[in-house]
């Protein structure tokens, strides 16, 4: 067993306020308008700076907003991690996408036997889970290889404006018309199709529409499906499953021999629907039909064991050596990861560079997120329980370091409900005050930062409607430590862990190209 190195300031922790961005203006800024005495005192008493969480600084295209997956990958890696969005788009631009082995195999397996190719994906340019340009490329590829293509679209309204689906549908319909192939077969809001919290009754609605052509609603085309949803009071995220029959009046459902291609590049929200299609022993809801597919392709690796069930992976993960978790584990140190359900994958899988298995001496605490339809109904979420568990862990003296995600700013921010966001900010402030007081009492230190912005801007000035997506504003970085070192400006997420290691008195590994933001000059 590796002999543990002796670290300074035990425990030294990282507290990620998910979606807590910085914006000078106070209008439409829930953080600025909330009563946050602990946060105000933290900024008054401790050195702080702002860091970048979007665009090229986190391996995304210039100007692209960051997100939780990207943020936690960059954080845990201590280097800029070039994201799947960028990687796949580059392949499309270079033409390599159209030669991808998994995609070619799936398309040809269906088309050579006169079966159909069904493409699933979140239709938007939000760039968080998917991108419309990728979906268009997959349609073109399947069409050019002789396949008949049906598209099952999931509407966004979360990483985009709440009622923006029609512009993406028009773009896709125009593209398919010019191409001479492709047809939208169903429309479902991401709330149902892309659940990640085991709300299987939601996923079933999407599955039934895609696999069985069965849904509560029907429309003559995708535009009408969205317009009818708006008339029912549903925004894009919550559009109920709607099938669009073919000219013969029958739905274009997935049948035996067809191939399915899931075009989301982010894994966490694509897993549950994928399981319903590929797992023989699936039991989370009754499947109306279980089509025997020629192939099921996941654009990226959604889960290690999915290939055991026959799934093909178009883009395998790039390997990241010496992420924070792996590195401190090699040093013999004990680490804690703690989050509630909505962000659990982020402080584990994504923070570890896409590795599912825990490192040696890596303890994980999962707090169940509340079972409510949307988090504006419970802005405190499960933070009171998370706070108590973390405080107990800090007091126990067991851990050398910890990574904690506080989900409220992002999850409540996505609802666009300003009053609920103010309540969420105040709940975060109260919990943060107690956590930091405990760290101080045991002579520990911490970094308080965020993975991206959200709650600091809740109004879309272009549409005049609530802004429910992330932002490109910088986020705070606070050094909660005893030494009072000033901080360097101009940092990014890749610099956070090198700073944490510096605080622990541990030299960073050579793979980490980020630098410590502590200015000891």
UniProtKB/Swiss-Prot annotation:
<feature type="binding site">
    <location>
        <position position="414"/>
    </location>
    <ligand>
        <name>Mn(2+) 1</name>
    </ligand>
</feature>
<protein>
    <recommendedName>
        <fullName>2,3-bisphosphoglycerate-independent phosphoglycerate mutase</fullName>
        <ecNumber>5.4.2.12</ecNumber>
    </recommendedName>
</protein>
<dbReference type="InterPro" id="IPR005995">
    <property type="entry name" value="Pgm_bpd_ind"/>
</dbReference>
<comment type="subunit">
    <text>Monomer.</text>
</comment>
<dbReference type="InterPro" id="IPR017850">
    <property type="entry name" value="Alkaline_phosphatase_core_sf"/>
</dbReference>
<keyword id="KW-0464">Manganese</keyword>
<feature type="binding site">
    <location>
        <position position="410"/>
    </location>
    <ligand>
        <name>Mn(2+) 1</name>
    </ligand>
</feature>
<feature type="binding site">
    <location>
        <position position="343"/>
    </location>
    <ligand>
        <name>substrate</name>
    </ligand>
</feature>
<comment type="pathway">
    <text>Carbohydrate degradation; glycolysis; pyruvate from D-glyceraldehyde 3-phosphate: step 3/5.</text>
</comment>
<keyword id="KW-0479">Metal-binding</keyword>
<feature type="binding site">
    <location>
        <begin position="266"/>
        <end position="269"/>
    </location>
    <ligand>
        <name>substrate</name>
    </ligand>
</feature>
<comment type="function">
    <text>Catalyzes the interconversion of 2-phosphoglycerate and 3-phosphoglycerate.</text>
</comment>
<dbReference type="GO" id="GO:0030145">
    <property type="term" value="F:manganese ion binding"/>
</dbReference>
<feature type="binding site">
    <location>
        <position position="190"/>
    </location>
    <ligand>
        <name>substrate</name>
    </ligand>
</feature>
<dbReference type="InterPro" id="IPR006124">
    <property type="entry name" value="Metalloenzyme"/>
</dbReference>
<dbReference type="Pfam" id="PF01676">
    <property type="entry name" value="Metalloenzyme"/>
</dbReference>
<keyword id="KW-0413">Isomerase</keyword>
<feature type="binding site">
    <location>
        <position position="452"/>
    </location>
    <ligand>
        <name>Mn(2+) 2</name>
    </ligand>
</feature>
<keyword id="KW-0324">Glycolysis</keyword>
<dbReference type="GO" id="GO:0006096">
    <property type="term" value="P:glycolytic process"/>
</dbReference>
<dbReference type="Pfam" id="PF06415">
    <property type="entry name" value="iPGM_N"/>
</dbReference>
<comment type="similarity">
    <text>Belongs to the BPG-independent phosphoglycerate mutase family.</text>
</comment>
<feature type="binding site">
    <location>
        <position position="18"/>
    </location>
    <ligand>
        <name>Mn(2+) 2</name>
    </ligand>
</feature>
<dbReference type="GO" id="GO:0006007">
    <property type="term" value="P:glucose catabolic process"/>
</dbReference>
<feature type="binding site">
    <location>
        <begin position="158"/>
        <end position="159"/>
    </location>
    <ligand>
        <name>substrate</name>
    </ligand>
</feature>
<dbReference type="GO" id="GO:0004619">
    <property type="term" value="F:phosphoglycerate mutase activity"/>
</dbReference>
<feature type="binding site">
    <location>
        <position position="451"/>
    </location>
    <ligand>
        <name>Mn(2+) 2</name>
    </ligand>
</feature>
<feature type="binding site">
    <location>
        <position position="470"/>
    </location>
    <ligand>
        <name>Mn(2+) 1</name>
    </ligand>
</feature>
<feature type="binding site">
    <location>
        <position position="196"/>
    </location>
    <ligand>
        <name>substrate</name>
    </ligand>
</feature>
<feature type="binding site">
    <location>
        <position position="68"/>
    </location>
    <ligand>
        <name>Mn(2+) 2</name>
    </ligand>
</feature>
<dbReference type="InterPro" id="IPR011258">
    <property type="entry name" value="BPG-indep_PGM_N"/>
</dbReference>
<dbReference type="GO" id="GO:0005829">
    <property type="term" value="C:cytosol"/>
</dbReference>
<dbReference type="InterPro" id="IPR036646">
    <property type="entry name" value="PGAM_B_sf"/>
</dbReference>
<feature type="active site" description="Phosphoserine intermediate">
    <location>
        <position position="68"/>
    </location>
</feature>
<feature type="binding site">
    <location>
        <position position="129"/>
    </location>
    <ligand>
        <name>substrate</name>
    </ligand>
</feature>
